[in-house]
Amino acid sequence: MKLPCAALGLFAIGCGVDAPAPCDRTVPGNVCTIAGNGENGYSGEEGLALEARLSLPMDTKVAPDGSLMIIDWNNHRIRQLAADGTIHFIIGNGEIGGSIDDPATGDFNHPTGILFNPAGTQLYISAWHNSKVRAYDLATAAVVDTCGDGRRAYFGDDSPALTASLDLPASIAWSPTGELTILDQANQVIRQIDTAGKIHRLAGQCVVDMAAPSGPGACPDGVAPTACPAPSGKTVCGDPAIWCSTACSPGYGGDEGPALAMRMGQAFGQAADPGGRILYDPQGNLIFADTTNDVIRSIDPAGIVHRIAGVAPVNGVAQGGYSGDGGAALSAQLNHPVDLALGDDGTIYVSDVYNHCIRAIHPDRTISTVAGVCGMKGSSGDGGPATKALLNRPYGVEWNAGTLYIADTGNSVVRAIRLK
């Protein structure tokens, strides 16, 4: 059955999409739709997940009980795919919510990341457009704010996390020592909440140095940016009275140097789409998608930054595209990488969003495609090899127990591949 075209914001959705058909998920390498009927919208609670409507699913997370949590992004909800194939509402009122001064409630404005606490009793949520991180208690259904005052700004480093300001927190991860790490997307930094509840800048810089008319331009050679008034962590190349209220500028720099001195590139502003995700590997390296720079980078336990995939920007221009499968990941081109997942063997899976495919950075640092046909957008391939299927802006990817889960965002479905 073909479904009608529709458009919403940054995404073209539901355009001539084939409704998903049942397929055998046990066949290694085959791709199967497991949630969503391919039609953008909201429906299906307590029914079969394959008959439900989703709206731009952004990511997934396997719960301690084995069910799959789904970020139903444009429905502002978290939903649960149960083992029997049914779908259930977990949290989110389905409307944009959570004003600055409201108490913590079940309102979410485009959540982008979910994470269980180590005990498996709470679900932490990156409430992206709320500019907060919230926690949902699975036993009591209580919601509490854990970071962010709801103001889209950059304030509060080295202060209590609840009084700090974030700007589009895109992703969260637990450090090996129990700190909550946040990719603060529009602030172009990675921040961390220590076990005492204070927030600190871990990597990146919030510098205002965009070219006119949006910014003052780069600082002259040898001139350091000027700090904005405390408690802001922002610096500017120009008059602080004019530019301290301006958004932080994307940039690129700092490879093989200290993380606090590096620059990254993430989308910002009201029209931004969700950007870089983060994860830790067992060795304690923090891996992140430097999305608008079209590279994947890591920060080692000593705090040094390394580029691990993608061609670095040249003279400030990102080198996005598609190339390099079968060769070195550092020589390959990516196009708007967003999400990351870590396989049991150390393979890093990357949602190469604008290439409409999922790439794999192998332990020997070569790269390949594991799902989708890079450079081709569509919706097809259920029941066949994942590398021949067509995806549409897949923003989310997760690995769990030999299965790769894909949030096939533009098709408003979740798909799965049994790889091992």
Question: What kind of region is each of these model predictions?
Answer:
Residues 62-65, 116-120, 174-177, 280-283, ...:
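Residue-level detector of Asp-centered blade-edge/turn motifs that repeat once per structural unit
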Residues 67, 86, 121-122, 179, ...:
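Generic structural signal for coil-to-beta-strand starts
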Residues 70-73, 125-128, 182-185, 280-281, ...:
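Conserved beta-strand positions in repeat-built beta-propeller and related beta-rich domains
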Residues 76-78, 131-133, 188-190, 294-296, ...:
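Structural signal for beta-propeller blades
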Residues 393-420:
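Blade-level signature of beta-propeller repeat domains, shared across WD40, Kelch, NHL, RCC1
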